[in-house]
Every structure is written in C-alpha cells, then in structure tokens.
Amino acid sequence: MMSDLPLMELKDIHKSFGNVDALKGVSISINAGECHCLLGDNGAGKSTFIKIMSGVHQPTSGQIIINGQETEINNPRDAIDVGIATVYQDLALIPLMSVSRNFWLGRELTKKVGPITVMDFEKCNSILMTEMDKMGIQLRDPSQSIGTLSGGERQTVAIARAVFFGAKILILDEPTSALGVYQTSNVLKTIERVREKGVAVIFISHNVSHALAVGDKFTVLSRGETLGTAKAGEIDFQELQAMMSGNKELSVLKK
C-alpha cells in the first residue's frame, strides 16, 4: 500500500568530479508502495544519481533523508543497511549457476551433516519456488541454470532476491532494456507486485511508455538537473517524450 509520508527524500543533490558537475541540485522523494520513474536520455545524470543512492558515490552536497532522518550513505553496505537495494542492468547473476544458487548467492541457509556445514538445498529450493511463485514465475526446476531463463525471468529473479532480503527501496536500472514485448510485460507486472508489498520502487528508464505503465510520479533529468516532477495523470506520453528530447519545457513540471 502507498504511504503519504516519504520513505526517502534526496534534496538538492550535487555531485562534481573535478571541474565537471554531474548533478546540479537534483531532488526527488518517494513513498512506500510508490513507483517513482526517473527519466532522461543518455548523459542526463541517471547513473550518477543511482550510484549516490546506492552508496557507490557520495554527494558533493545535499541531503539524503530516510524515514524523516538525515542519513549518510558512504558505501553500498550503508545503503543495504537502510533497506536500499539496486538491481543493475547486469543483474549480478552468474549464468552457469542454478537459479537457486543465484538467488541465495552467499547468503545460503545451511545445515549440519555430521561435523560439516553444507547448504540446505531442500529449504533453499523450497523458499525460492515460493518467492518466484509470488512474482508470477513458475520455475521448472530450482536447479536449472539461470542462463536457461528468459531475460524477463532473470530480471524477476534479481528483483525477488532483493525484496526477499529486505529491500524497502528498490532501485531498478533500466529493467526493461533489451527485452521483448512479452518479457517487458512480465517485468512491469513484477514491479506492480513489488509495490503491492509496500516496497518503494525507483524505476530508471529512458522508455516513456514503460514508465507510464507503472509510474506514480515522473521526474525528468537533463544534463544533471531536475526539470521537474509530475504525478500520473498530470502528463502524457507526448509531453514526457518532448521533455526528454529537449524540444520543449513543460509547465506542469515546473509547478
């Protein structure tokens, strides 16, 4: 369910690399159960902004506020500790390993077999199948190679993994990039399911139609600056597309 109170706010975020200003006063807020789409063409500053939220980079100036408290995110561990998980385009999956091993990936449940500690495959596989079923994916076998899954299914595994391990704020970096129509539809359905769990989703994209399908709010970035934010229903495809391409400014985004 969507909350009225911001789960995370980023206020007036600046990031400079030497003399290059990558971000110039970017601000967004996101509530629990909300999908906030961050749109922009290549070079808009989306990747830098993701890395600040996920602790890879630290802002030159600005505030990060989590649950009403100003928070320092100095590294990826800090981000994880406050409930921020990022699913990058490469998904952090190992193609030749099983779906189950990819899902757990260093956090396996274990059991004792005599003096030896081993992965509890039965329990791990059972949880995996349950979590994937919640996301609308029926796996043939948890031991099958993750490389045998479609792109959309692999994306869903990465999202399900992040949610299972406690993500309250889920950052999705171009999750529908290079996917076909059917696979894209499945990923967008997965995002809806995640929102229903109360997880806040930050959907990074340059695809306006995909963003409009799931977004509650839309923020457009251009050359490191926020051009503004609009809620669903306040803006249409043509306006967003024109803003992203730099052809016009939108009064609704300036309000």
What does each model-found stretch correspond to?
Residues 2-255:
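Glycine-rich phosphate-binding loops of nucleotide-dependent enzymes
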